[in-house]
Amino acid sequence: MNPIVINRLQRKLGYTFNHQELLQQALTHRSASSKHNERLEFLGDSILSYVIANALYHRFPRVDEGDMSRMRATLVRGNTLAELAREFELGECLRLGPGELKSGGFRRESILADTVEALIGGVFLDSDIQTVEKLILNWYQTRLDEISPGDKQKDPKTRLQEYLQGRHLPLPTYLVVQVRGEAHDQEFTIHCQVSGLSEPVVGTGSSRRKAEQAAAEQALKKLELE
């Protein structure tokens, strides 16, 4: 891997790996090698959830469990992680197999999000929980400062449904139009038809549910509710 690109990535992350092989593994998609990042992703997912839950618990002492769960879901969902990945310019650092490279895998939100979680897992193994917690809180500082409890933290499908029901309009319909990839690494494309929009909106994700949520979020943006 290009040392200049890797050094730039570590500067953007705010962390330099002591064991560079952990960084390489975190950046390796399963399409590229048998030593890929999925186990690190599993670890990082749990660490991220803990760090964000702990931060919300102490920031919002009077907020109930439901609102805290919704805020956490907003902060750890795939498109938020993909936003972080783009801020880190992570796409050009990924190690992908030929098929994923050809299909633009370095832009896929699910791959970008999974890689951020793998990096978290890698940093934890390379250091300790205190270091990775400090790093995550630094990445999330602005988002944690801006987030607040309330209806906006409901997931996009729920908000879209409530908006339409409140206006006595038909509920949205979701249609799977494409499924790409092998069983262990699929990408779903969903068309969502919404009353008031002339064309269906499109969402993609690593599961049908995630793709539907992404489509609903696009619909909310087109309805200028996001």
From Swiss-Prot:
Record Pfam families: dsrm, Ribonucleas_3_3
Signal sequence annotation: none
Cofactor note: Divalent metal cations, preferably Mg(2+). While only 1 Mg(2+) is detected by crystallography, other evidence indicates there may be more than 1 metal necessary for catalysis. Binding of the second metal my be promoted by substrate binding.
CDD domains: DSRM_RNAse_III_family (cd10845), RIBOc (cd00593)
Known cofactor(s): Mg(2+)
Intracellular or extracellular location(s): Cytoplasm
GO biological process, one term: regulation of gene expression
InterPro entries: dsRBD_dom, RNase_III, RNase_III_dom, RNase_III_sf
Highest taxon of source: Bacteria
GO cellular component: cytosol
Domain DRBM intervals: 155-225
Residues binding Mg(2+), per UniProt: E41, D114, E117
SMART domains the UniProt entry points to: DSRM, RIBOc
UniProt note on regulation of activity: Non-competitively inhibited by 2-hydroxy-4H-isoquinoline-1,3-dione. Activity is down-regulated during cold shock by direct interaction with YmdB. Also down-regulated during entry into stationary phase by an YmdB-independent mechanism.
Swiss-Prot/TrEMBL induction comment: Expression increases as the growth rate increases. Encoded in the rnc-era-recO operon. Processes the 5' end of its own transcript leading to mRNA instability.
Keyword annotations from UniProtKB, A to Z: ATP-binding, Cytoplasm, Endonuclease, Hydrolase, Magnesium, Metal-binding, mRNA processing, Nuclease, Nucleotide-binding, RNA-binding, rRNA processing, rRNA-binding, tRNA processing
Predominant cellular place of this UniProt entry's protein: cytoplasm
EC nos: 3.1.26.3
Chain ranges of the RNase III domain: 6-128
Impact noted for substituting E117K: In rnc70; slower growth, loss of RNase activity. Dominant over wild-type. Binds ds-RNA
Function: Digests double-stranded RNA formed within single-strand substrates, but not RNA-DNA hybrids. Involved in the processing of rRNA precursors, viral transcripts, some mRNAs and at least 1 tRNA (metY, a minor form of tRNA-init-Met). Cleaves the 30S primary rRNA transcript to yield the immediate precursors to the 16S and 23S rRNAs; cleavage can occur in assembled 30S, 50S and even 70S subunits and is influenced by the presence of ribosomal proteins.
Quaternary structure, from the entry: Homodimer.
PANTHER family, alphabetized: RIBONUCLEASE 3, RIBONUCLEASE III
Family: Belongs to the ribonuclease III family.
Protein name in UniProt: Ribonuclease 3
Organism expressing this protein natively: Escherichia coli (strain K12)
Upper lineage: Bacteria, Pseudomonadati, Pseudomonadota, Gammaproteobacteria, Enterobacterales
